[in-house]
Amino acid sequence: MTNIRKTHPLMKIVNNAFIDLPAPSNISSWWNFGSLLGICLILQILTGLFLAMHYTSDTMTAFSSVTHICRDVNYGWIIRYMHANGASMFFICLFLHVGRGLYYGSYTFLETWNIGVILLFTVMATAFVGYVLPWGQMSFWGATVITNLLSAIPYIGTNLVEWIWGGFSVDKATLTRFFAFHFILPFIIAALAMVHLLFLHETGSNNPMGIPSNADKIPFHPYYTIKDILGVLFLILSLMLLVLFAPDLLGDPDNYTPANPLNTPPHIKPEWYFLFAYAILRSIPNKLGGVLALISSILILILMPLLHTSKQRSMMFRPFSQCLFWILVADLLTLTWIGGQPVEYPFIAIGQIASIMYFLIILVLMPITSTIENNLLKW
């Protein structure tokens, strides 16, 4: 008799995705982040659900409802901080996952990669609207500044901003709709993640060497289930260390002050995971130019398959490209640091240089380096 997991219509899908899936025998721990992102998403949906039971999306009570969750709800503080710091863990896993894709040439799976970029945008949108909900100073002014960027769009900009606000300023209507978006988007992310996985399983996983691995496959379970569980343990350990010992380490103290439209904080800045894009936005003195650079900094990932000029898929055997990749990582860390600094000398200049370097490395230096490496293969 055939095993039920191979015949049952529902279990068959799970079986083909997580149990009997043929996986390359040499994929490293860099391939763990897909499953970790899945765990992060489940964790965020569950903690978010319990927070939504006590949260009120009204300008008068939003701030106090978050305080009420932390003070009066049973284990409300841990749920709140798991949700807030869970977002940080989510983005750490996301950046490492994308970095892995760039390093090992996984972007040649076009459908998987493009849906991944859409997922990145969706997660960023979710995090942005979520940051507005506690209705602290940084929530309010972050929402005001970022939504205001849309006014840079010629002709329809101002109307668009007021349409998103639901009025002439960030107010009750804005908060209510942002809560609605923040509730629905994670489920859209979950659906997109399934499509992401569907397309990945059409081709099978890439591997560190970037060569076909059809001749050497092993079942996903037990090998990679055990390996993933180890990753999950590390994820939960680091998250709980953050939540229990330094819950406000990555937050902004300004967000413990209730939103006040009459008082602008001295430094308006987003959460740490948006700082690199914020630095690129600020490095251009023109409003529309800054907005275009901001969008391009993420959208540039779509171009990666077109910019791939190397005869080898992975960077494993390409030392020059490896150097460039790590320079790019250092550049992104520099941008992240600059995004959190005040707009004054020397930070403005450093930000502008780092922004130019970011686009220069991806659009010009990487394709040229790959071509040089191709010619070196002939020797």
Swiss-Prot record:
Ligand binding (heme b b562): 83, 182
Domain of life: Eukaryota
Keyword set includes Isomerase: no
Keyword line: Electron transport, Heme, Iron, Membrane, Metal-binding, Mitochondrion, Mitochondrion inner membrane, Respiratory chain, Transmembrane, Transmembrane helix, Transport, Ubiquinone
Compartments reported by the entry: Mitochondrion inner membrane
Membrane topology: Multi-pass membrane protein
Cofactor note: Binds 2 heme b groups non-covalently.
Cofactor annotation: heme b
Ranges that cross the membrane: 33-53, 77-98, 113-133, 178-198, 226-246, 288-308, 320-340, 347-367
Predominant location: mitochondrion
Residues reported in the UniProt entry to bind a ubiquinone: 201
InterPro entries (UniProt xref): Cyt_b/b6_C, Cyt_b/b6_C_sf, Cyt_b/b6_N, Cytb/b6-like_sf, Cytochrome_b, Cytochrome_b_C_euk/bac, Cytochrome_b_N_euk/bac, Di-haem_cyt_TM
Gene Ontology MF terms: metal ion binding; ubiquinol-cytochrome-c reductase activity
Additional facts recorded: Heme 1 (or BL or b562) is low-potential and absorbs at about 562 nm, and heme 2 (or BH or b566) is high-potential and absorbs at about 566 nm.
Function description: Component of the ubiquinol-cytochrome c reductase complex (complex III or cytochrome b-c1 complex) that is part of the mitochondrial respiratory chain. The b-c1 complex mediates electron transfer from ubiquinol to cytochrome c. Contributes to the generation of a proton gradient across the mitochondrial membrane that is then used for ATP synthesis.
Family to which the UniProt record says this protein belongs: Belongs to the cytochrome b family.
Oligomeric form and interacting partners: The cytochrome bc1 complex contains 11 subunits: 3 respiratory subunits (MT-CYB, CYC1 and UQCRFS1), 2 core proteins (UQCRC1 and UQCRC2) and 6 low-molecular weight proteins (UQCRH/QCR6, UQCRB/QCR7, UQCRQ/QCR8, UQCR10/QCR9, UQCR11/QCR10 and a cleavage product of UQCRFS1). This cytochrome bc1 complex then forms a dimer.
Protein name, UniProt field: Cytochrome b
Organism: Capreolus capreolus (European roe deer)
Record gene name: MT-CYB
